[in-house]
């Protein structure tokens, strides 16, 4: 059926058209013919004649309903929204011409004006889908972002991350479901728990039959890209452009592979954080500007071994950072897992690889040699200028250390100070990168319709409990930073305290793009939290599961439940050699690309630990540092039953296979 103007119309609009006065039909025909070509023609418009917004909407409808139906639907939607507005305007002209008393004409005006205004307001709220800029670091702790107000960050501020927080929302209760790099990335891309996507441990490979959220965004009309650290043991899926590091990547002069050349890596001169940012901006400059974009910027930094950019190597050389309150923790009130880990600043932070003191090499010790080769793997990549900067800072510092002949707690304090100094110097470059990206958005008028997300793949220990690294379900590891800016949707300077998990990121991106969330995704969009008010039907607890034992750091397998106040953890599994014998050992990067079990055991990565099967319970309100395991204590029976029931429910509903 066609309208009087020659365009397609629904039956209801056609019948209404015939009832309108001739003068009204004449005005609509004249206006639509001169200003609205969609309404004044007998056939749908060519794609080239559509506005970018219309084209984006058609692309989305194509994905959902098919090409022919989509173009018809979008064209009719535009026509339907405009007809009431045009009618109001034309009827107003008709009334003015009518031979009626002035007071009657005036009494009719408010209704027409309100009708036209409401229609126009509704039209203005229909905005283009937002661009998505997702920035993720590797092992960035909340304690080193000054917006969170920790003692370390007060001495090493992050002004650009603070700027992002002022523009948007700071999330105080964001957590991961498995505090380990590759599993966390797999969770991001699939929106699934580790046991669901297949990437439970570092050495495993993700189930590539699982759909990545990037594939769904791409089909829905987004142009998609990822730059920096991928580390997923598979080809990037659903990306129009990628420029990614090989494996873990190097801080200096790293190798990248790019779109269409997966597996073919080329070295690029420079610092990884700067290069990754350069490639992100290059994508923004050359992208298809008729489409919204989703850009993932994944930094290697601040992953171990914390190599600062050459110009910032001595940035915090004279700063004395405070020791955490729990630095000298003896784990007396915890189970065996807290004592048998291998991630202590005093014993396990490597003097050569981590603290850059090659002068301490002991050629007769396997661990010392392994540490030396790991450091040289980075140093030998330096250009002459980079090597000069490295030697100028570290050689005098190391000389002072050796002359001081520190021992005991004084040596441990030296290790801590220099670990933190290198770590926050690496973060300084990350913060500058965030500033560059925010500046680009503002300079190119993209900031108003771009949601910017900053997070980390997990938290990290900055000396709490005497540790570095992550893995445990304890707060510093499970807890991860999250800052989101979305002008017009998130109030500036707002804070969210409700529980968020990284399984929520993929559903959020899909919701922002108007794409239906697949049923198998267990997370939920966090858009309702953007309003800044407490969402009553929000989740009350989270599930966590760490699988990667036995391997580096010897953190035992465990799962658990965290509520707003309590945390229940179950440590389980066979120890040491028995786990290896049952083929639970995953080959991991070592001194020769992939180490063997024997080589790793020689450098004390494995011990003949005992089998474990025990629980820990913490009241985070009265014991935020998790120093006192109250499992089994009198008065905790009710909360223990409640959490045990919830843990069993999670395992059953999620079909956890361990």
Feature map (PLM): residue ranges:
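Intrinsically disordered, low-complexity proline-rich regions
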Residues: 6-9, 22-39, 43-47, 55-60
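Low-complexity, intrinsically disordered or signal/transmembrane-proximal segments
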Residues: 8, 13-14, 35-38, 61-63, ...
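Formylglycine-dependent sulfatase
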Residues: 99, 104-107, 113, 119-616, ...
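Ser/Thr-rich, low-complexity intrinsically disordered segments
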Residues: 50, 64-81
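Cysteine-centered motifs
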Residues: 87-89
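Tryptophan (W) side chains
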Residues: 17-20
């Amino acid at each position: 059926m066609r309208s009087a103007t020659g365009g397609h119309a629904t039956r209801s609009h056609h019948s209404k058209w015939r009832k309108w006065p001739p003068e009204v039909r004449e005005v609509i025909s004249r206006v639509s013919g001169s200003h609205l070509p969609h309404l004044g023609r007998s056939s749908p418009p060519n794609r080239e004649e559509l506005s970018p917004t219309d084209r984006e909407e058609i692309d989305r409808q194509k994905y959902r309903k098919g090409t022919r139906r989509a173009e018809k639907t979008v064209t009719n939607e535009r026509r339907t929204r405009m007809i009431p507005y045009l009618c109001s305007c034309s009827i107003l002209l008709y009334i003015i011409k009518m031979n009626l008393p002035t007071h009657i004409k005036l009494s009719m005006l408010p209704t027409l004006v309100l009708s036209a205004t409401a229609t126009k307001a509704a039209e203005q709220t229909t905005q283009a889908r937002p661009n998505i800029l997702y920035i993720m670091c590797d092992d960035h702790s909340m304690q080193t972002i000054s917006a969170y107000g920790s003692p370390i960050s007060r001495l090493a501020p992050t002004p650009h991350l603070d700027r992002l927080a002022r523009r948007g929302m700071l999330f105080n209760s964001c957590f991961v479901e498995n505090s380990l790099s590759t599993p966390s990335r797999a969770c991001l891309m699939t929106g699934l728990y580790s046991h669901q996507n297949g990437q439970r441990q570092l050495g495993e490979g993700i189930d590539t039959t699982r759909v990545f959220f990037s594939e769904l965004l791409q089909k829905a009309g987004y142009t998609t890209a990822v730059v920096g650290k991928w580390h997923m043991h598979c080809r990037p899926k659903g990306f129009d452009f990628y420029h990614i590091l090989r494996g873990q990547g190097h801080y200096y002069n790293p190798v990248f592979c790019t779109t269409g050349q997966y597996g073919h890596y080329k070295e690029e001169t420079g610092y990884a954080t700067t290069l990754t940012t350069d490639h992100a901006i290059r994508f923004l400059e050359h992208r298809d500007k008729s489409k919204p974009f989703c850009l993932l910027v994944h930094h290697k930094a601040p992953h171990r071994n914390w190599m600062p950019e050459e110009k910032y190597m001595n940035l915090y050389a004279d700063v004395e950072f405070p020791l955490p309150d729990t630095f000298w923790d003896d784990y007396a009130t915890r189970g065996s897992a807290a004592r048998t880990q291998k991630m202590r600043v005093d014993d396990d932070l490597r003097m050569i690889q981590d603290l850059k003191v090659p002068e301490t090499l002991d050629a007769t010790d396997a661990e010392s040699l392994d540490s030396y080769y790991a450091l040289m793997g980075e140093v030998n990549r330096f250009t002459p200028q980079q090597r000069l900067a490295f030697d100028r800072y570290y050689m005098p510092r190391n000389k002072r250390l050796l002359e001081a002949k520190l021992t005991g707690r004084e040596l441990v304090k030296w290790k801590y100070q220099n670990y933190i100094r290198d770590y926050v110097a690496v973060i300084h470059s990350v913060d500058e990168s965030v500033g560059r990206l925010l500046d680009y958005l503002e300079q190119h008028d993209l900031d108003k319709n771009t949601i910017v997300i900053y997070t980390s793949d997990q938290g990290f220990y900055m000396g709490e409990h005497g540790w570095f690294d992550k893995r445990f379900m304890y707060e510093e590891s499970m807890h991860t930073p999250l800052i989101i800016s979305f002008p017009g949707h998130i109030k500036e300077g707002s804070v969210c305290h409700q529980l968020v998990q990284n399984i929520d990121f993929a559903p959020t991106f899909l919701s922002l793009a108007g794409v239906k969330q697949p049923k198998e995704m267990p997370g939920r969009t966090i858009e309702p939290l953007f309003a800044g008010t407490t969402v009553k039907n929000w989740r009350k607890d989270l599930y966590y599961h760490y699988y990667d034992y036995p391997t580096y750091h010897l953190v035992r397998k465990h799962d658990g439940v965290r509520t707003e106040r309590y945390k229940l953890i179950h440590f389980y599994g066979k120890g040491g050699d028995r786990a290896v014998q049952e083929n639970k050992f995953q080959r991991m990067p070592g001194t020769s690309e992939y180490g063997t079990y024997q080589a790793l055991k020689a450098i004390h990565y494995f011990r003949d630990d005992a089998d474990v099967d025990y629980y820990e319970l913490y009241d985070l309100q009265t014991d935020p540092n998790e120093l006192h395991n109250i499992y089994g204590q009198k008065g905790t029976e009710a909360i223990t039953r409640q959490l045990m029931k919830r843990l069993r429910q999670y395992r059953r509903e999620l079909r956890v296979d361990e």
